[in-house]
Amino acid sequence: MNILFALHRLFWAAADWLYPPHCAGCGHHGERFCASCLAQVVLITDARCAFCGDKTSDGSSVCMKCNRNSVSFNAAASWAVYGGELRKAIHALKYRQDMALGAFFATFLIATIEKQGWNFDLVIPIPLSPDRMKERGYNQSELLSRPIAFYFQVPHSSMALIRIKDTGTQVNHTKIERDLMLKDTFYANPDKLNGRKVLLVDDIITTGSTINHCAKALKEAGTSEVYALSIAKTLKKDHRCSDETNKS
């Protein structure tokens, strides 16, 4: 842990001391995400397919059913299963400006990275469209990705990958529909990416379409490896009801 990461955590700890938070899960006063809600989180301890969410027998990030030539990322992992109190907390991070949750969840993502043993030299958040960024005022994925970059002491870039097409909401769309919506949506800057090993950070992986299209753009721009990471992963039965950010 380096000084930037320590200062980042200290900043949010001081903010919580000055303005005690309410739990983003149950509303309990005094904690950002209380121990009771944290205990209810279903951790992902086995390898799961980034597309359908099923367990993979060989420990890979894509199951045999979803294994296709169009898979562009090298590996993907999520900390927990999307649902319950965690779903409420991610909603607070994205839509209620509870930005301190970014630093909170980043600590669990760091542990996930260390478990995976990935080697990367650039951290990139999944980008929002200019309109969505203007509306929200911040990118929730960047609140996760920056402390990760601080911790591992690698560069961070929110401009190496940008969204150039407004796709509108992805909620209630299937993977096939999302793939069509996301085609040619992302642009990766070759000047910032040649030969890089990228860690791509998002809040939720639902059908895997977003991370796959981002990875495709990054690989076409010269990135050598792409690893995708998220707080949560939806299981296949939840794909249509997920409130995954319409990252437009």
Regions found by a protein language model. Name each.
Residues 1-202, 206-248:
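Glycine-rich phosphate/pyrophosphate-handling loop used in enzymes and phosphotransfer proteins
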